[in-house]
Amino acid sequence: RVGLVGHNGCGKSTLLKILAGKLARTGGRMTMGSTTRMGYYSQNQTETLDLGGTVLGELRRLSDPRTSEEELMSVLGLFMLGQGYFDRDIATLSGGERSRLALALLFLRRCNFLVLDEPTNHLDLPLIEWLEDYLTRSTATLLMVTHDRYFLDNVCNEIIEIDDQSVYSY
């Protein structure tokens, strides 16, 4: 579980977007294992969620088609989004609700490589604590950017710092 830190504008989010295939590389090579199921969590949920759809539509679009409605409801419940959210338009959700929906989608996809950009933004304390517990128990590989030092220290077992075009590992 690796945390990536550095000052604003040093390229942390850009690196994550390149890894997730959201931005093109300008050079070099990148190889993923054939069994890697990457899940990308953007700090700006409008980049990953269909704002023209409903919560249920987005769950159906981005999760395994064999997932039952009961499992969808159960996962939404874990992220404090009850059944009443199924028919809600994503565009009407608050920033925190969109964040919780995006995290629920990662959970449903059963990713084994999580790339998380500021995952605690817009989350309230109970959900941050739940996410911390989930990530520390998860067997998935984790690469995360966050400015939340407490969360970083509790979740990650390695820290990589980008500073003045240099990289340091702690």
PLM feature spans:
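ABC ATP-binding cassette signature C-motif
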Residues: 1-170
